[in-house]
Structures are given as C-alpha cells and as structure tokens.
C-alpha cells in the first residue's frame, strides 16, 4: 500500500498520482462518491462503477448507529456487505457528531452524543471509532476529530486542535496494537481559518509517520475566498510524497481549483443531493429539470455527455418523471451528475498530463460560472482575481 506521484504540473501544485490500497489502485486526482449508509443513493454498485468511480466513501457514524459494526462484520466486512469490491474510505463520524447529533459533550476521553435518529446516548472515543472501522474493513480510515464551524474563536479552535491531535495519537496507538496493517490511517488537519494553528497541526503530524493527510474543518460555512486561501496555505505545508484529501468538498469549480492547489482526493454529497432536488450539471452551470422550458425539450441533459441517462432519455421525459415524483428520475439525474464530475476529473487529469491545466482551468471556470445563475459565488471579484 503506497502513494506514487507520477507527474507534476509545471505551473501549479497539481499532480497525477496512484494510490495503492488493499482493494485496488486509485488514480488521482480523484472524486469519491458518498455512500453514507453503504450505498450511493438511488444507484447500484454496478452503476456507480459504470459512471467511473474507483473508490467510494461511507460514514462511520451512520453505520455505527445502523445496522451496527457487528452486523457488517458478520456479513464479511463492508465490501462484501454492500457488494463493492473496490477501495472504500470511511470517515470517522466526527463531523456528523457535530452537525447532526444532539446534546453532545466533549471530554478528554471522547464525545457524548445523542443519536439524531432516536435520541439514544452514545460515547465515541478514538479507540471505539478505530474499532468500528476495523470491523468495517475499509481501506482508508479516519481518526475521531473535532470539527468546528466557521467563526469559531482562536482559543476555541486551538483547544479543539489540541484534543484532535491527542486523539490522533491514541488512534495511531490503537491501530499499531490491533492488526490493522491493511488499512491506511490519514491524519485530519484541523485549525479552523487560523494559519498559525494549521501550521502547528501539520508540523506535529509530520512526526507521526502518517500515510496521508486530510484537510478537515473546511466548507463549514465560510466564504469561497476563505476556503481557497486556507486550503492553498495548508497544502503548501504538506510533504510532496503523501496524498492530500480535501474533506466534504466537491462542487465542479472547487474540484478544479483544489486540484490546482495540489489536492489529490475529494468527496461530497452534492451531486447526489442536487439530483434528488431536480438539479443537474452542465458545462455552462447548474440547471433545474423542473423548469417549464424543458417541457417540450427532447434533447439530452447535455449533448456531449456519454452517461446512460444522456444516451437514452430526454429532458422532457426526465422532467415528466420528476414532476410525478417517480424515483427513476432521481436515479437518472444522479447518474448524470456523477458522470459529469468523473468526466471533469478525466479532463483535469488529461490536462495535467498534457501540461495545460492552467488553460483548462480558465476555460472551464469562465464557461461554467459565467452562466451559472443558480450557483453564484458570494463575491465575483474573487474569481476575477483567481483567473488572472
């Protein structure tokens, strides 16, 4: 199990890489579809593979609550349980504890929280989170961490970082003592939007001999310029030979920008969630299938798209299904949205290989954002500056 940088872009921090895991290789930069409960919503594993996925993400918090790690372990581990034989990354559940759970209480040993499902109380420790992920058998695992929202004070953020780093050390110790050699434990870099704290996090993690680094606490309500600024700064501190994972980020423009900053891995629920609300991606921005203009539009969602949806069906038909609340429409839109992102990543990797990423980035962002009225950034001048 290893990570190899195959080619670097001359003008940015972007690179092509290959991440080898117990269940196979992953070409980077890569987007990972999210299968929160063990399934990418509305799709079969075969459909997920067909759109281009090499790795998926599942959620420790949700799988711990239902069906529970013991059921999955008895079923042969997560891969066999869900029918997916390629790599799987599981996050620690820390973000979900802070975003979904109620009445949470942080102590040195871990986090007390009440399930968002039925209110039952649980106590997550770094060791328990590792134990759950061991039972799942996922290829890449994450330690328990504290994720704060945008606007947290310096001292609140510093305290959360200190606990996160101590929990990381405990997670590493658990892994070493419990026969988890086939699983790669990444460190999660916290520190909010304070450069000093991000730097401290990286410096202390460099001594822990981790196989990869995840950037956490990003895309938590901050403006886009803040997100890009702290991402770019944090990546500049990281070693070249290790993979970098930007957690919870996956909008098309963020993928392109993130790759140019040196990010190798992304995940996000956005493409599947948008699909269930009738929103689909095009090269000129997001569109909504509910719009009346598509009532008699017998063209595909996007003319040059090679996905199953665009090869077989028209906007008019998909709109009809969606307005009748037919679940097939959610599936068709999900297939298209995921394939759009995988085609985008294919184009990004090709542009790196051909030494023209900067040119591709400018062309894509100019076209995508100029017409994307439903997805305007908070400050257009930010993009003007980034495209110079």
From Swiss-Prot:
Entry GO CC: cytosol
Keyword Cell division: no
Cofactor dependency: Zn(2+)
Keywords: Glycosyltransferase, Metal-binding, Queuosine biosynthesis, Transferase, tRNA processing, Zinc
E.C. number(s) listed in UniProt: 2.4.2.29
Residue span of region RNA binding: 248-254, 272-276
Residues that bind Zn(2+): 305, 307, 310, 336
Single GO MF annotation: tRNA-guanosine(34) queuine transglycosylase activity
Catalyzed chemical reaction(s): 7-aminomethyl-7-carbaguanine + guanosine(34) in tRNA = 7-aminomethyl-7-carbaguanosine(34) in tRNA + guanine
Cofactor comment: Binds 1 zinc ion per subunit.
InterPro entries membership: ArchSynthase1/Queuine_TRR (IPR050076), TGT (IPR004803), TGT-like_sf (IPR036511), tRNA_ribo_trans-like (IPR002616)
Active site per the UniProt annotation: 91, 267
Lineage: superkingdom: Bacteria
Enzyme category, top tier: transferase
Pathway(s) of this molecule: tRNA modification; tRNA-queuosine biosynthesis
Entry binding sites for substrate: 91-95, 145, 190, 217
Matches recorded under Pfam families: TGT
Record-level GO BP terms: queuosine biosynthetic process; tRNA wobble guanine modification; tRNA-guanine transglycosylation
Subunit structure: Homodimer. Within each dimer, one monomer is responsible for RNA recognition and catalysis, while the other monomer binds to the replacement base PreQ1.
Role: Catalyzes the base-exchange of a guanine (G) residue with the queuine precursor 7-aminomethyl-7-deazaguanine (PreQ1) at position 34 (anticodon wobble position) in tRNAs with GU(N) anticodons (tRNA-Asp, -Asn, -His and -Tyr). Catalysis occurs through a double-displacement mechanism. The nucleophile active site attacks the C1' of nucleotide 34 to detach the guanine base from the RNA, forming a covalent enzyme-RNA intermediate. The proton acceptor active site deprotonates the incoming PreQ1, allowing a nucleophilic attack on the C1' of the ribose to form the product.
Name of this chain's protein: Queuine tRNA-ribosyltransferase
Species of the source: Dictyoglomus thermophilum (strain ATCC 35947 / DSM 3960 / H-6-12)
Gene: tgt
């Amino acid at each position: 199990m290893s990570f190899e940088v195959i080619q670097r872009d001359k003008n940015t921090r972007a690179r092509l890489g290959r991440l080898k895991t117990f269940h196979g290789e992953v070409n980077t930069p890569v987007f990972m579809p999210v299968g929160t409960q063990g399934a990418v919503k509305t799709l079969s594993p075969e459909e997920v593979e067909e759109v281009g996925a090499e790795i998926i993400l599942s959620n420790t918090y949700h799988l711990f609550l239902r069906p529970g790690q013991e059921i999955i372990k008895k079923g042969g581990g997560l891969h066999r349980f869900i029918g997916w034989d390629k790599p799987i990354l599981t996050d620690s559940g820390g973000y979900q504890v802070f975003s979904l759970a109620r009445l949470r209480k942080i102590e040195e040993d871990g986090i007390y929280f009440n399930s968002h499902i039925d209110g039952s109380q649980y106590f997550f420790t770094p060791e328990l989170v590792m134990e759950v992920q061991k039972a799942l058998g996922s290829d890449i695992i994450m330690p328990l961490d504290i994720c704060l929202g945008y606007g947290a004070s310096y001292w609140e953020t510093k305290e959360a970082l200190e606990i996160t780093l101590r929990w990381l050390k405990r997670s590493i110790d658990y892994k070493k003592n419990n026969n988890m050699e086939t699983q790669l434990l990444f460190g999660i870099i916290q520190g909010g939007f304070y450069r000093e704290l991000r730097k401290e996090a990286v410096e202390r993690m460099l001594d822990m001999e981790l196989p990869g680094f995840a950037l956490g606490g990003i895309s938590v309500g901050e403006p886009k310029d803040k997100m890009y600024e702290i991402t770019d700064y944090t990546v500049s501190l990281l070693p070249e030979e290790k993979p970098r994972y930007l957690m919870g980020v996956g909008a098309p423009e963020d993928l392109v920008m993130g790759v140019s900053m040196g990010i190798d891995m992304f995940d996000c629920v956005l493409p599947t969630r948008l699909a269930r609300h009738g929103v689909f991606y095009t090269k000129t921005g997001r569109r909504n299938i509910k719009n009346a203009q598509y009532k008699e539009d017998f063209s595909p969602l996007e003319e040059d798209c090679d996905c199953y949806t665009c090869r077989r069906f028209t906007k008019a038909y998909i709109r009809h299904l969606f307005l009748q609340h037919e679940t097939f429409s959610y599936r068709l839109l999900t297939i298209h949205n995921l394939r759009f992102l995988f085609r985008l990543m294919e184009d990004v990797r090709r542009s790196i290989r051909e030494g023209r990423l900067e040119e591709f980035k400018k062309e894509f962002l100019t076209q995508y954002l100029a017409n994307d009225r439903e997805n305007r950034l908070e400050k257009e001048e930010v993009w003007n500056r980034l495209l110079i």
